[in-house]
């Protein structure tokens, strides 16, 4: 008894599968899906239009199945049992039964319609490419334009950085020359003041500094050449301190002139450099923004007369409906491309 029931279920499943593969089922179902799938988009939420189309599809499926089951003598209970049997759970059977299941499940129906819409978009694009040999500009993804913009921005960036470095180096060189000349002017009065103070300071019976006309230093019973020519042979400050001798002005000489201004100069230089680089950065951002805007405008305007002339001479003008359909197909093709890449 069980064997007979299994055989009956198997026969019902095979019979239904054969019907779903045949033209009596596939032709009206495919016609309906292809005509109605254009409005389905995976990004859109379920709209009232989707529900209405699903209801029409459900009525069509019920009509076709009812006509076939009545013709071969299969009742509704036998059909339900066949659909829930293990034979209908295989991958092949599920693929065949998908159009039937879509009539009862809106999620399956929507996924089926979106997939068919994408397939038709790709098919339309393929036909256009085969006919024209290349895709029109409206169907390209704009990758080349973006690449050109990026290359142009990099050229501008390198040029601005190069000019900024040259200007900064020139400015720093000018400052160094100015500071060097000022330092030389400051050294002369410092040395003169030190010589005068040393000539007035004597201690322990030793004359370290004599009148400017005969400037000599007596140290360790040795005569040294004039101070103006042999400044490096003067006694070190530490030795003078050990003898209890003080040379007014000499102990503060190391803190005067450009050496004392190093810390202040470093801070000021950093501040100026920061301000200078900020100005260049703002200038760079402005140039990049202007260039990007001009490139986009030129890209949009470029080739419009050429494309219009080619379309007028080589191809018949597209109707508004065809343009709208082509635009929708392009958007869905881009969506499919993104989904394939993300996977």
Swiss-Prot record:
Residues with PTM Phosphoserine: 85, 147, 201
Cellular component terms per the entry's GO annotation: ciliary base; ciliary transition zone; cytoplasm; motile cilium; nucleus
Assembly behavior: Interacts with ARL3.
Spans annotated as Disordered: 165-188, 279-323
Gene3D superfamilies registered for this protein in UniProt: ADP-ribosylation factor-like 2-binding protein, domain
Protein name, entry field: Cilia- and flagella-associated protein 36
Highest taxon of the lineage: Eukaryota
Protein's cellular compartments: Nucleus; Cytoplasm; Cell projection, Cilium, Flagellum
Sequence ranges of Basic and acidic residues compositional bias: 279-293, 301-323
Coiled-coil blocks: 147-187
Any Pfam family hit: ARL2_Bind_BART
Role, per record: May act as an effector for ARL3.
Family: Belongs to the CFAP36 family.
